[in-house]
A protein has these predicted regions:
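Active-site pocket-lining segment
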Residues: 12-15, 58, 121-190
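Buried hydrophobic packing segments
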Residues: 13, 17, 39, 100-105, ...
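Cysteine-centered functional microenvironments
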Residues: 17-24, 29-31, 83-94, 156-163, ...
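N-terminal extracellular/periplasmic Venus flytrap/periplasmic-binding protein-like
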Residues: 20, 26-111, 121, 174, ...
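Condensing-enzyme catalytic core mediating Claisen C-C bond formation in acyl metabolism
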Residues: 71-135, 139, 146, 204-205, ...
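Internal helix-turn-beta structural module
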Residues: 152, 173-183, 188-226, 230-231
Length: 238
């Protein structure tokens, strides 16, 4: 009631970010294509098998679209603003899903012979303007890096939730992240963004990637509706 101007769709926040950072439709589509290509390759290699539990016969993410290209994306209508740049193809799809992780003390894990994937170093949250909701990971990641006494260059693996291509690109730019380190097996634009599951999914994925790639530090970060962000830095135990 007191702030009616703040009631808008997440898609409009993506358009706001695209305008603020002067991101073209093609730039966003390039990012979406990359996410789909990485997810397609990871799926063909069986990289997701360790991470997926079959439910009612479903054992594969349905959002992956191997044939995504510029021509296909060019045909899509603008989803939120007729004068904007964001389409369904550059947004994370609505998907059903669930994720779980086990967080415990190291002693408990060892006493119970549990496979330790990684160690949590620090986590941080931050707020931003609600109309620029997707920028939340910037401040949250900066806080987490400072608490961990690390720089972005020290981070080997980044799992950045792809709510929209525009906000992902903005976060990558402001955090100065090496694109080669981001979402190695694709992100939410290809895999989906089931509400309530994303934090566990990307953090668990980051831990799995540290082991697979034999790296030391990973950053898992996501935006949150109404103008928040969260970031977690984890360390390999290998």
């Amino acid at each position: 009631k007191n702030n009616p101007h703040l009631y808008f769709s997440m898609g409009i926040t993506a358009e706001n970010v695209a305008k603020k950072y002067q991101l073209t439709r093609k730039e966003q589509q390039d990012f979406a294509i990359s996410s789909q290509q990485k997810a397609t390759e990871a799926d063909s290699k069986g990289n997701f098998k360790k991470e997926i539990t079959t439910v009612n016969g479903c054992s594969r993410d349905e959002g992956i679209r191997p044939n995504t290209n510029q021509e296909v994306l060019d045909k899509l209508k603008l989803a939120f603003d007729e004068s904007g740049t964001v389409t369904a193809g550059t947004s994370s799809p609505l998907t059903d899903g669930a994720a779980t992780t086990l967080i415990c003390e190291e002693k408990f894990a060892k006493d119970n012979n549990l496979d330790i994937l990684a160690r949590i170093i620090t986590t941080s949250v931050d707020g931003c303007e609600p109309e620029l909701m997707g920028l939340g990971p910037i401040g949250a990641s900066q806080k987490a890096l400072k608490r961990a006494n690390l720089s972005i260059e020290d981070i080997d693996i980044v799992e950045l939730n792809e709510a929209f291509a525009s906000q992902s690109l903005a976060c990558i730019r402001d955090l100065n992240i090496d694109r080669k380190k981001i979402n190695l097996d694709g992100g939410a634009i290809a895999l989906g963004h089931p509400l309530g599951a994303t934090g566990a999914r990307i953090t668990g994925k980051a831990a799995e990637l540290l082991r697979r790639e034999n790296k030391k530090y990973a950053l898992a970060t996501q935006c949150i509706g109404w103008g928040m962000g969260i970031a977690t830095i984890i360390e390999s135990t290998n």
